[in-house]
UniProtKB/Swiss-Prot annotation:
GO terms, biological process: DNA recombination; DNA repair
Subunit composition and interactions: Homodimer which binds Holliday junction (HJ) DNA. The HJ becomes 2-fold symmetrical on binding to RuvC with unstacked arms; it has a different conformation from HJ DNA in complex with RuvA. In the full resolvosome a probable DNA-RuvA(4)-RuvB(12)-RuvC(2) complex forms which resolves the HJ.
Keywords: Cytoplasm, DNA damage, DNA recombination, DNA repair, DNA-binding, Endonuclease, Hydrolase, Magnesium, Metal-binding, Nuclease
Gene Ontology annotations for the cellular component aspect, listed alphabetically: cytoplasm; Holliday junction resolvase complex
EC id: 3.1.21.10
Record protein name field: Crossover junction endodeoxyribonuclease RuvC
Cofactor: Mg(2+)
């Protein structure tokens, strides 16, 4: 399975692609960052992120996309930009009918380091080891995108099976009962 991980952001949107599957070691396909100047208007920055994500989706042709869930931050402006960039990636994947996994930072950290409280250096170190890279991807947004892709590679299939096994609830009815 090929997974595109997206670490959303307006200034730097990390993108990382890994291949892997049951019984196979994960391998790096590509990693990079879409950058936008802080001086540009938000609409222009979002368009640049959208175009970058579209280009990656068309070129690397992933089987799934993993996006970091936005978490609460003190800086509302930062969290808004992160949420908007994440939404752009989600819509791009949805338009192509790709499965989308959303993961909190602590879920991603736990998946790649064993601890949901790992710092950026620990995540970068483990991504480097897990993908057998000569050095940690830079900037940290790129390493985080690869960590997201690895998280989905390992957790996505199990989550999909759990969703498929859970009975659908009737819409608009609390608890799904009539």
């Amino acid at each position: 399975m090929r997974v595109l991980g997206v670490d959303p952001g307006l200034t730097r949107c990390g993108l990382g692609v890994v291949d892997g599957g049951p019984g196979r070691r994960a391998s790096l396909v590509e990693v990079g960052v879409v950058r936008t100047p802080a001086s540009d208007e938000v609409a222009d920055r979002l368009r640049a992120v959208s175009e970058g994500v579209d280009e990656w989706l068309d070129r690397v042709r992933p089987d799934a996309v993993a996006v970091e869930k936005v978490f609460s931050q003190a800086n509302v402006r930062t969290v808004m930009g992160t949420a908007q960039a994440g939404a752009v990636a989600i819509v791009a994947a949805a338009r192509r009918g790709l499965p989308i996994g959303l993961y909190t930072p602590s879920e991603v950290k736990a998946a790649v380091t064993g601890s949901g409280r790992a710092d950026k250096a620990q995540v970068g170190f483990m991504v480097t080891k897990l993908l057998d890279l000569p050095e940690a991807p830079r900037p940290a947004d790129a390493a985080d995108a690869l960590a997201l892709a690895l998280c989905h590679l390992w957790r996505g299939p199990a989550l999909a099976r759990m969703r498929a096994a859970t009975p659908a609830r009737s819409p608009g009815v609390p608890g799904g009962r009539r």
